[in-house]
Amino acid sequence: MNNNLPTGSIAAVVDLLNKENVIAYPTEAVFGVGCDPDSETAVTRLLALKQRPVDKGLILIAASFEQLKPYIDDSILTAAQRKAVFDCWPGPVTFVFPAPATTPRWLTGRFDSLAVRVTNHPLVVALCNAYGKPLVSTSANLSGLPPCRTVEEVRAQFGDDFPVVEGATGGRLKPSEIRDALTGELFRQG
């Protein structure tokens, strides 16, 4: 069975997400795997697939800042900090924001913060808009293997039955940069 999901079948992808499935999709640099951030079942599936401990925390990718607001606390950002963030968005820079106590631990891990990004990848923007919220986003690769850059690489690592949204990555060579929204500290070079 081939579970390739053509870019025109966003409704089919949303249906899979609503059923707590993990999917693969192209992002700015590599393919990502993602799921519904509000579903502990889906996130647990993603973590098991990636062999990733829950305490590391995850990244949310969204079409707009509004989609991220329920998961973060931006109230303590100064005007300058807010400008630094919004000058980079939409785009391939992930920012770590304080997280309110209501943000699930399966997203934040051992932290009181959450990494989030407003993407400029058109397919991911369309997907998040159709879904009405952000997606958990982590690189599509099994532990110890390089991140996938093509549908074929996703198939090779995850199998032919794994649902993959067809499309091209944004052409960036490195994963997104990660910075602290409050301090500007660089956690990962992009």
Curated annotation (Swiss-Prot):
It is found in: Cytoplasm. InterPro entries: DHBP_synth_RibB-like_a/b_dom, Sua5-like_dom, TC-AMP_synthase, TC-AMP_synthase_SUA5. Keywords: ATP-binding, Cytoplasm, Nucleotide-binding, Nucleotidyltransferase, Transferase, tRNA processing. Residues 7-190 form the YrdC-like domain. It is an enzyme of class 2 (transferase). SUPFAM superfamilies: YrdC/RibB. One of its GO terms (biological process) is regulation of translational fidelity. It catalyses: L-threonine + hydrogencarbonate + ATP = L-threonylcarbamoyladenylate + diphosphate + H2O. Its main location: cytoplasm. GO terms for cellular component: cytoplasm. Its EC number is 2.7.7.87. GO terms for molecular function: ATP binding; double-stranded RNA binding; L-threonylcarbamoyladenylate synthase; tRNA binding. It holds the Pfam family Sua5_yciO_yrdC. PANTHER family: SUA5, THREONYLCARBAMOYL-AMP SYNTHASE. Belongs to the SUA5 family. TsaC subfamily. Required for the formation of a threonylcarbamoyl group on adenosine at position 37 (t(6)A37) in tRNAs that read codons beginning with adenine. Catalyzes the conversion of L-threonine, HCO(3)(-)/CO(2) and ATP to give threonylcarbamoyl-AMP (TC-AMP) as the acyladenylate intermediate, with the release of diphosphate. This is Threonylcarbamoyl-AMP synthase. The gene is tsaC.
